[in-house]
C-alpha cells in the first residue's frame, strides 16, 4: 500500500524550480554523462531487466517491449546524446509586438513545470522521458508498470548517480512505486503536477482520461490501417504492408488492418505473400478469405469476426477488410481508427489528396509504411509519446511539444483605468 505521496510530489515541484536555473550547456553535459553511464552500467541494467523478463511469458506481446539488450542500450545512449545536440526549446521568442501606449509584448517558450508519465512494460521510456524533460526544463514523475519495475529502478538509479555528480537535485526525476495506489495519487496530484501523459494500451489511456484531475495528453493506442486502393501498385503495397505489420508488432504504429478495394482482390495473395514467412495470422472477411484460400497457409488464415476490426493486435495478426469503393474505405477507417496513423497505397494523386484531407488522424501517409510514425524518423529526436488527440499536441511529441509559453510585458509606468 503506497503511503501519502504529496511529500514526493512537493519535492519534485521544488526541484523543477531549481531546474529552471540550469544552463543549456550544463543540461547537455548531464545528458552526455547519462549516455556514458548507460553504456558503463550495461551489465547492471540488463541483469535487472532479466528479473522482469523472468516473470513474463515469452509469448506475451509485451515481452519484446520489455526486453533490453546491449544493442538496444547502445541505441538508447545514442538517442540521449542526440537530444543533447538539439537546440534548446526554451526562451524562444514566438511573437513580438508593441502596443500604441508603448508596451512591448513578447511571447516566450517555457517549461510546463512537472510532467507525470504513466507507462507499461517499456523501460526505454524511462530514458526517453528523462532526456526530453531535462532538455525542455521539466521535472518528471515516472509511474511505470509492475512488469518493468526492476528495470526502471535500475535506470533511475543510474540517472540519479549522474545528477549527484553534477550537484543537481535528484528529485527532478522521480520513480513512483509500481502499484495502483501510486497511479491514483498521481492522477489526483493537483497543485503539484502540470500535465499527465499516459503511454500504453487503450485500457490504460481510457483509465487515465476518465480518472485524472490534471490535464492529459493521450498517446500510444494505435489501430492503424493501410488501404490498398483500386489504383495501388502491387509491389509497393506488398512491401508497405509487410513492413508496417512485421517490423515490430508490439509498437503502436504497427499495421492492424489492411483494407482492399474489391476490384483488386486478385492481387491480395501477392500483397500478403511476404507475411507468410513471418507467420502472420490473417483474419479475413468473406471475400478476402476466398481470395486467399489456397494461396495463404490454411493454419494462418481465419474468418474475420466483428471483433477483428477496430482491434490493436500488438502481435503477428492482421485483419483484412474488402470495400466496394474509396468512400467505403474512408467509412471503415472513420469507424475503427484510433486517429494514430493511416495509409493509402495508390498511384492516383487526386485520390491520395482526398485521403489526406478527409482522414482524421495524427499521421496520414501516401505510399509510405506507418512504421515511420516516430519522433526520430520525423527529425524531432526522441519522443515522449505520440499524441492521438488535437490539443495541445498531435503526432510524435518532441521537445517543442512539451513546452508552453508565457507573455512577457515591458513598459515604462503604463497604467489602465
UniProtKB/Swiss-Prot annotation:
One of its GO terms (cellular component) is cytoplasm. GO terms for biological process: L-proline biosynthetic process. The keyword Oxidoreductase applies. Gene3D superfamilies: Aldehyde Dehydrogenase, Chain A, domain 1, Aldehyde Dehydrogenase, Chain A, domain 2. Pathway: Amino-acid biosynthesis; L-proline biosynthesis; L-glutamate 5-semialdehyde from L-glutamate: step 2/2. It is an enzyme of class 1 (oxidoreductase). Transmembrane segments: none annotated. Its main location: cytoplasm. Its EC number is 1.2.1.41. It catalyses: L-glutamate 5-semialdehyde + phosphate + NADP(+) = L-glutamyl 5-phosphate + NADPH + H(+). InterPro entries: Ald_DH/histidinol_DH (IPR016161), Ald_DH_C (IPR016163), Ald_DH_N (IPR016162), G-glutamylP_reductase_CS (IPR020593), Glu-5-SA_DH (IPR012134), GPR_dom (IPR000965). GO terms for molecular function: glutamate-5-semialdehyde dehydrogenase activity; NADP binding. Catalyzes the NADPH-dependent reduction of L-glutamate 5-phosphate into L-glutamate 5-semialdehyde and phosphate. The product spontaneously undergoes cyclization to form 1-pyrroline-5-carboxylate. Belongs to the gamma-glutamyl phosphate reductase family. This is Gamma-glutamyl phosphate reductase. The gene is proA.
Amino acid at each position: 500500500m503506497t503511503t501519502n505521496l504529496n511529500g514526493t510530489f512537493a519535492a519534485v515541484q521544488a526541484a523543477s524550480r531549481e531546474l529552471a536555473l540550469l544552463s543549456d550547456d550544463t543540461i547537455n553535459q548531464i545528458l552526455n554523462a547519462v549516455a556514458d553511464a548507460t553504456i558503463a552500467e550495461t551489465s547492471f541494467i540488463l541483469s535487472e531487466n532479466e528479473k522482469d523478463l523472468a516473470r513474463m511469458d515469452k509469448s506475451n506481446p509485451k515481452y519484446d517491449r520489455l526486453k533490453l539488450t546491449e544493442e538496444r542500450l547502445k541505441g538508447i545512449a545514442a538517442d540521449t546524446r542526440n537530444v543533447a545536440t538539439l537546440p534548446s526549446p526554451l526562451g524562444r521568442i514566438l511573437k513580438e509586438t508593441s502596443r500604441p501606449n508603448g508596451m512591448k509584448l513578447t511571447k516566450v517558450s517555457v517549461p510546463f513545470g512537472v510532467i507525470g508519465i504513466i507507462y507499461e512494460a517499456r523501460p526505454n521510456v524511462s530514458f526517453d522521458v528523462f532526456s526530453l524533460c531535462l532538455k525542455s526544463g521539466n521535472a518528471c514523475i515516472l509511474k511505470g508498470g509492475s512488469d518493468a519495475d526492476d528495470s526502471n529502478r535500475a535506470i533511475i538509479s543510474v540517472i540519479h548517480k549522474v545528477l549527484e555528480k553534477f550537484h543537481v537535485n535528484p528529485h527532478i526525476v522521480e520513480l513512483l512505486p509500481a502499484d495502483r495506489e501510486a497511479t491514483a495519487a498521481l492522477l489526483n496530484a493537483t497543485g503539484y503536477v502540470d500535465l499527465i501523459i499516459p503511454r500504453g494500451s487503450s485500457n490504460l489511456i481510457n483509465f487515465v482520461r476518465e480518472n485524472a484531475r490534471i490535464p492529459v495528453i493521450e498517446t500510444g493506442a494505435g489501430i492503424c490501417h493501410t488501404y490498398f486502393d483500386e489504383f495501388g501498385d502491387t509491389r509497393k503495397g506488398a512491401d508497405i504492408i509487410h513492413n508496417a505489420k512485421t517490423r515490430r508488432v508490439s509498437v503502436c504504429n504497427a499495421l492492424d488492418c489492411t483494407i482492399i478495394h474489391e476490384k483488386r482482390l486478385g492481387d491480395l495473395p501477392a500483397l500478403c505473400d511476404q507475411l507468410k514467412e513471418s507467420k502472420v495470422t490473417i483474419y479475413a472477411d468473406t471475400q478476402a478469405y476466398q481470395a486467399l484460400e489456397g494461396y495463404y497457409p490454411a493454419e494462418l488464415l481465419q474468418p474475420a469476426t466483428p471483433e477483428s476490426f477496430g482491434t490493436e493486435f500488438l502481435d503477428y495478426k492482421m485483419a483484412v477488410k474488402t470495400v466496394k469503393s474509396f468512400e467505403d474505405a474512408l467509412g471503415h477507417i472513420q469507424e475503427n481508427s484510433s486517429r494514430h496513423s493511416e495509409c493509402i497505397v495508390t498511384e492516383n494523386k487526386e485520390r491520395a489528396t482526398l485521403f489526406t484531407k478527409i482522414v482524421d488522424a495524427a499521421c496520414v501517409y501516401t505510399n509510405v509504411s506507418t512504421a515511420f510514425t516516430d519522433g526520430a524518423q520525423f527529425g524531432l529526436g526522441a519522443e515522449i509519446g505520440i499524441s492521438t488527440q488535437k490539443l495541445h499536441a498531435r503526432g510524435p511529441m518532441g521537445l517543442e511539444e512539451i513546452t508552453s509559453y508565457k507573455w512577457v510585458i515591458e513598459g515604462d509606468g503604463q497604467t489602465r483605468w
